[in-house]
Each structure stands twice: as structure tokens, then as C-alpha cells.
Design a protein with these regions (language model features):
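Hydrophobic membrane-insertion alpha-helices, especially the h-region
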Residues: 7-26
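Acidic/polar low-complexity surface segments
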Residues: 113-134, 247-266
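Positively charged n-region of N-terminal signal peptides that target proteins for export
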Residues: 1-6
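Short, surface-exposed interaction patches in beta-rich subdomains
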Residues: 183-288
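Short linear S-[DN]-x-LW-Φ motif typified by the pepsin-like aspartic protease active-site region
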Residues: 26-107, 140-146, 150-152, 161-167, ...
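Structural motif
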Residues: 64, 96-98, 158, 177, ...
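Right-handed parallel beta-helix
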Residues: 153-196
Length: 288
């Protein structure tokens, strides 16, 4: 039970630190009502309709508080639109294409939220009800991509959901501190996915390289493509949660030294088409 004790101790520490941080914010701002007034007065809604982008072969995005959605384009061009909240001082999103790389940067916040002002304007619950509802319905950022394989995709979100449909990438990395990741009709080569708190779902998902997935708190539920369903080598571990997979996979649940941990391994016949290593610390792993 050592792993369980470690998990509970870590979770307790995080909650204590979070409570202390919120108390400090309240004291600094003079109370929740004043904090809401400050945050609401500084926020503004920004809209950009679907706009064509210059050609690029890689994506590098760092966003603090925003949902990001990647969809297939209707033609051979890439497009971007957004409906997001930001401060009144400047537009919330910097977009550029340099040396074949599309860069998306959050102009209002840093990923670490390292100072009190950013935290005051960043946490959604500090906004008045109308502003918070407007943010929730705003839609976030939508990126439309043509049917081509990108060389590299790196996506970092501090707080927000990431939804991807139809992406093909030779290298892929996603790091989400608070939010979920949904992958549909997606083909990934060398991949690294890290979710601190949120769920992972995948439908018609292909891994044709080495893929590593870490989910700290949340479930992972994956439906593989026919190619990966037959040829993917799978090594799955949970510290506290079940692992389920179809009998047709031909994998095995292996013995572990911990009563709450599980280990599943599937080795396909012939040469593997890819290699998936997935670990969930507090959550289930489900293959369909």
C-alpha cells in the first residue's frame, strides 16, 4: 500500500497549498466581491472569424486559460478563428508563422501564473456570473488543418480542454495541467502526452511510432484504429485503477506488488506497428 499512501499524501498536500493560495488571494484583494469587480472590469471578449493562415509544417502553442480545437479543413489551406476572453489592455492571442512553424501564444497570462495579478484575472470563478457564462460559451480557439502530415506538433495548456480531429503528425507532444484531451481520427508518430488532471479519450486512434502517455488524475479511454488494433504493442500501468481490454487483443494482466495497481501488456504477432506505454496514477485505462 505504499503507492496509495504516497498518492493520498500528495493529494492532501496539493489541496492544502491550494487552500492557502486562495486565502492569500482573498486577503490581498480585499475579499471575493472586490476581486470579482477587478477581474470583470478588466476582461473583454475578443472574436476573430475564420481567417486563412500562411503555410506551415509544424505547430507550437502555449496557452494558459483557453480551449483549443483542431478540425479538418474543407480545402488545402489552414485557417484560424477564436472567440476568447482577454484583458482590455491588449489582444489575448499572438499568432505568427515563422520558418514554417505556426506559433500561438497567450498574451495575457504566463503558463505558470507567477504573480497575483495574473491569478486574479485568470481564475474563472473570480469573474461575475455573466462574464463567466460568456467565457464558457465563447468556444476558444479553432484551428482548421488540411489533410497533410505535420512534422511536429507541440501543445501546452495550463487550463483548458484540447480536442483534435483528423490530425497527422510525425512528432506530437501535449501537456495539459487542468483539462481533458480528446483525439479522433488521429495518426501520431513519436508522441508524448502528459495530463495532470483530466481525462483522455481517443477514437480511431493510430500510433505508428513510440508513444508515451501519463495521466496523473483521470481516466484514459481509447478506441484504436484497425492498424493499431492489430499491430500495436501495449504496456499499460495504473497505480490506483482498473485496466480493461477486449479479449481479442490477446493481452494479459500481469502480477504486481501492489494490491491497488494493475499492469497489462499486449505483444502482437509479427513486427509491431507502434509502441504505446500508458500510465494512469489515479484512474482507469479502458481499451475498446
Amino acid at each position: 500500500m505504499k503507492k496509495l499512501n504516497k498518492i493520498l499524501l500528495t493529494l492532501s498536500l496539493v489541496l492544502c497549498l491550494g487552500g492557502g493560495l486562495l486565502i492569500g488571494i482573498g486577503a490581498f484583494a480585499g475579499g471575493i466581491d472586490e476581486a470579482q469587480e477587478i477581474a470583470g472590469a478588466r476582461m473583454q471578449h475578443y472574436d476573430q472569424e475564420k481567417t486563412q493562415l500562411d503555410e506551415f509544417s509544424a505547430i507550437d502553442a502555449e496557452l494558459a486559460i483557453c480551449n483549443l480545437e483542431i478540425r479538418p479543413s474543407d480545402d488545402e489551406h489552414a485557417y484560424l478563428e477564436y472567440h476568447i476572453e482577454g484583458t482590455r489592455e491588449k489582444a489575448p492571442l499572438h499568432v505568427s508563422v515563422e520558418n514554417g512553424v505556426l506559433q500561438l501564444r497567450d498574451e495575457n497570462y504566463t503558463i505558470s501564473h507567477s504573480n497575483v495579478e495574473q491569478i486574479l484575472t485568470g481564475f474563472l470563478w473570480l469573474l461575475p456570473d455573466a462574464e463567466r457564462e460568456s467565457y464558457a460559451d465563447g468556444g476558444g480557439i479553432i484551428l482548421y488543418l488540411p489533410p497533410s502530415t505535420l512534422t511536429s506538433v507541440q501543445l501546452t495548456l495550463a487550463m483548458g480542454d484540447l480536442s483534435i480531429d483528423g490530425l497527422q503528425a510525425s512528432q506530437f507532444a501535449a501537456d495539459i495541467a487542468l483539462g481533458s484531451l480528446d483525439l479522433t481520427n488521429t495518426t501520431l508518430g513519436l508522441s508524448e502526452i502528459d495530463l495532470a488532471m483530466g481525462t483522455l479519450t481517443g477514437d480511431n486512434l493510430t500510433f505508428n511510432g513510440v508513444a508515451t502517455i501519463e495521466v496523473s488524475t483521470g481516466n484514459a479511454e481509447l478506441t484504436l484504429s484497425p492498424e493499431s488494433n492489430d499491430g500495436l504493442l501495449i504496456d499499460a500501468n495504473t497505480d490506483m485503477g482498473n485496466i480493461t481490454a477486449p479479449e481479442s487483443y490477446g493481452g494479459d494482466l500481469l502480477d504486481t506488488d501492489d494490491v491497488v495497481a494493475n499492469h497489462y501488456r499486449r505483444t502482437p504477432q509479427g513486427t509491431p506497428t507502434g509502441n504505446l506505454s500508458i500510465n494512469a496514477e489515479m484512474g482507469e485505462i479502458i481499451f475498446h
